[in-house]
Amino acid sequence: MITRRALVDPLARQPLKTSTNILRAASIIPRCTFGSTASSAAADKTSSTWKLAKVPHRGVVQVSGRDTVKLLQGLVSNDVKALDSTTLTHQPPNMVYAGFMNPQGRMLADVFIHRQPANQDGSPRWLLDIDSRTLPSLVAFIKKFKLRSKVKLTDLSTDYHVVQAWDSNSQAPPTIAEKLSIDPRSPSIGYRGVLSAAEILDVAAAASTVDGLEYTLHRITNGVAEGALDFPQASSLPLENNLDYMHGVDFRKGCYVGQELTARTHHTGVVRKRIVPLSFYLAGTPPPASIHDVDPAFPHQLPTHLAEIRSKPISTASEAATKPARGKAAGKFTSGVYNVGLACLRLEQVRRWADSSSADPNSKHDALEFSVLSADGETTLLARPWIPSWWPHDQPVPSDQDT
């Protein structure tokens, strides 16, 4: 059994404040440590434009005991030995991002592993930041491999809260840099941490507290997937979920559950589908010029979870129009807010998207238009996919015919 304790949530829900500034990509400064006092925190907030949000749908599980490193090293996709201060000659990082896979190589959940001060006996004590909707099943999965290992699992979801801090272009205030860790998933996503109520109040003094929905919007517009909706349990692959691009996979570490398929996919270099951000719009209207063109007043419902996104050739005279395969499903919608979202799409089709209203006939050659049905079951939404700027530029785009 895992124990639960109650604690008052220090981040009360506040009205969403959407502005173009908070949607722009941030320049993240490497993490450094500063002293923190109440006066410095107050000074931070005076000039800071940083945002702080409680991350929605995240739970916290403590893993402690002398076999913690060994157990998790065999279960997650990244090298957690980097967190083990007992075996390193240098200061270890405070956080590692990774994924849990089942034996078939399908992803179960994403996880942030946060290093905490060791137990009195010197054994590790780590906090797992995972989706609260899959927490029970993931704990059960870990226990299958725990066996007689000297490891204790404790649900601390009511004692600790997962928070994210970010800004458009400035260096993190000292309080944020000290209390949180750089989120490795993308250069613009910000800082992340698991904090107690008192620690959150300290960090909140150096930033503006915003609604969790604003963090979700920031994450989606930066093309960063997270949680149970974007990573359907036991049905998606870690590389399709961009775990490799988000520094969540170490291909040099030894075996772990699900490693064989992940390694084989990496070494063949063929990943046909990946999660990308989308902008939604209606036929007869111009597509958004940027993923950051967010419309909080978008009047239509977004698609249902895992709704099929289809593509069709824009030009009926193109060679593609004669091939039925070009009209097949392009991928599936995973999550969204307002008029933006994320979807796992075929890259070969993503690169062929074009604006059907373009006056240039050359731009329509072999080009595709993407559409998906709204949750109301009647409205057809057009979708414009985007390739995040932080993706590696030397990655090939495989054809649907590649073997």
From Swiss-Prot:
PANTHER family per record: TRANSFERASE CAF17, MITOCHONDRIAL-RELATED (PTHR22602:SF0)
Transit peptide per record: 1-108
Family of the protein in this entry: Belongs to the GcvT family. CAF17/IBA57 subfamily.
Gene name in the database record: CAF17
GO cellular component: mitochondrial matrix
Stored InterPro entries: TrmE/GcvT_dom1, YgfZ/GcvT, YgfZ/GcvT_CS
Gene Ontology biological process: iron-sulfur cluster assembly
Top-rank taxon: Eukaryota
Subcellular locations according to the entry: Mitochondrion matrix
Organism listed in the record: Mycosarcoma maydis (Corn smut fungus)
Pfam families per record: Beta-barrel_CAF17_C (PF25455)
Keywords: Mitochondrion, Transit peptide
Stated name of the protein: Iron-sulfur cluster assembly factor IBA57 homolog, mitochondrial
GO MF terms, alphabetically ordered: transferase activity
